[in-house]
């Protein structure tokens, strides 16, 4: 069997779709996940901590979920701020497909699940919420942060959770 990671663009592992119950914006919902994505069996502890400790997002603007996986952060942002555009960014095409599927199931039309190069270069973000892909390595993670943090607008904030020393 081929070896891959959740940060592989096209995972070689079997998709193995599954349905899990997770809290999104204060209510329990059932969402789709799959093998070859980050934490396919449950909402991971880091994301849970992030979602439980961030303030209510602004009502509108462009928001970024960097390293979105199957979408719990992006879906929470989109639910809490229906007038916002939520950019769910990942390299993993399987994860992006799951975000789209989950957003459709929840009736969220304000989620854009895309690769980094599909985000228009002139978009400035009102907030960034992320459980970044730390397993890509320290140098690549720093590159991600140096790429996206300057795209915060002047009224913005960023909320990140990391479970390892960087």
Enumerate the predicted regions with their spans.
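N-terminal auxiliary segments of SAM/dcSAM-dependent transferases
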Residues: 1-25, 36-40
